[in-house]
């Protein structure tokens, strides 16, 4: 059984929280993005990354992929989100420099696949032990 949770906190140094998440448990999809603090529009970037990937997965579910193409598909989702963020930054000067980190996973049976951008990390909690992936 897979159990997940999400808790977000702005931390001690930030004025705002720039985290975004998306979970689709029935599809085994979990995404967390953290807008880069100190840059313009971090919250916008994290929200865009999560929504772009969520839409891609809703339109073209991962479960329909062959096992040997899953990681490539996850990579293409992250790349599409990155391109969308870059275009938004070009279109609107107030967004110049906006950025986000992201980690996502797809869990299918006893296998888990991960993709990330930046320094966001994934962890597994098993048998009372938290381990970085």
PLM region spans:
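PP2C/PPM-type serine/threonine phosphatase catalytic domain
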Residues: 1-133
């Amino acid at each position: 059984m897979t159990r997940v949770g999400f808790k977000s906190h702005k931390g001690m140094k930030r004025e705002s929280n720039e985290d975004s998440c998306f979970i689709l448990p029935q599809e085994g999809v979990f995404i967390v993005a953290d807008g880069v603090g100190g840059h313009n529009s971090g919250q916008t970037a994290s929200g865009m990354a999560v929504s772009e990937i969520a839409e891609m997965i809703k339109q073209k579910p991962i479960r329909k992929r062959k096992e040997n193409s899953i990681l490539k598909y996850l990579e293409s989702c992250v790349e599409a989100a990155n391109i969308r963020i870059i275009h938004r930054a070009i279109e609107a000067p107030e967004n110049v420099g906006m950025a986000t980190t992201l980690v996502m996973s797809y869990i299918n049976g006893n296998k888990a696949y991960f993709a990330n951008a930046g320094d966001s990390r994934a962890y597994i909690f098993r048998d009372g032990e938290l381990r970085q992936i």
